[in-house]
Amino acid sequence: EWEAVGQIVDAMGGVWFDVPRDMYYSDPLQNLYINQKAGYRLLTGDDAMQVLRFRDGANGYKDGDLGRIKTQQAFLTAMVEQLLKIENIAKINEFAEVFRENVETDLTLQNILWFAKAAFTGGLKPENVEFVTMPNTPAYAYSSTTSRLNGRYSEQSYVTPNTSQLLELVNTKLSPYAEVFTR
């Protein structure tokens, strides 16, 4: 759940991030309002969620959804770097509780706390966290949702998976098995 990211940001006391562009969007149908100025500053959980959700097809990223994905990855990188600072170890119980409330798992709270403590005490380093984007082909479509809001159609960005490259990614980055997946 993306909402957990905002809750963790608030528990951290905010995340310093360079918002790459002005972000304005209003969608009363979804009760979604985004109003973020470009620049480096401390983001609250709500600010972070606005930055992560922004995609406005008409006024959004030049490279569509791929631009949004790059911003999301840059934000999560900044968040992990700041989260793992030793001063945040005092907030470990709060982080574990947010995780427990938002992630479906059979781990006990004790298990979650054990993994969190291991991460904070050197088991996880920001330079070892890698984000990858699903291999894809960009696609565009006209949205009728936007037409209801402002009386016109708007081009929306989407991606479609490239299955052969996706299998290669699974085999080289994600699979713990020696066996190669072929389908």
Please report, for each region that a protein language model flagged, where it lies by residue:
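Flexible, polar/acidic helix-loop-strand segments at domain edges
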Residues: 6-94, 98, 177
